Amino acid sequence: RGPAADGRIKPDIGAKGTNVNSTVPTNSYGLKTGTSMSCPGIAGIMGQLYQGYKELNSGVNPSSALMKGVLLNSADDLGNPGPDFKHGWGEVNAYQAIKILENNQYFNSTISQAGNNTHSITVPLGIIQLNVMVYWHDIEGSVNAAPALVNDIDINLTNANGLTAYPW
């Protein structure tokens, strides 16, 4: 459970880790539980996402920030709405993650301190829920420092009528 010592949200994401069919000693299979079961699942999904991105983008390697952002934004929310210190962004959803890549539903850009970026997206009629995320590598704070974000980046969404929505 989180948060990290410097206040960052941890864990990032979860995966099935209870009663997972796995190998056991004596060349057999059995049910196992714990992060030793969920972590390989996340690693395998990330490997597939990297491969999928490269196939969709002429062999170009994606940034790790993009891949993590796609993974987190496609997760199925658990617990309290939004990210929390028990479930992170939720349970991994590999299908939704690859759909984000296949449909090119992401931006890759940079922003500086006190900067401002604007991106326009068209939301098709009938969409009931829209998940939008800004992701960056937020490095750890200094040891023994008070919890504080190293980079404080905010997002807001404004529709065609000028109505602005803020996260949480």
What are these regions (language model features)?
Residues 41-42, 62, 151-161:
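C-terminal, active-site-flanking charged/polar segments
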Residues 9-11, 63-66, 127-130:
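Loop/turn elements at helix/coil->beta-strand transitions in domains of secreted/extracellular proteins
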Residues 1-23, 72-76, 131-140:
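Catalytic-core segments of hydrolase enzymes
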Residues 9, 16, 67, 151-153:
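Residues that flank catalytic or metal-binding motifs in active/ligand-binding sites
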Residues 89-151, 159:
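Secreted peptidase-domain scaffold signal
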Residues 66-103:
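Secreted, periplasmic, or luminal enzymes acting at the cell surface/secretory milieu
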Residues 14-81:
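Hydrolase catalytic cores
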Residues 30-31, 83, 156-168:
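Noncatalytic accessory or regulatory domains flanking protease catalytic cores in secreted, cell-surface
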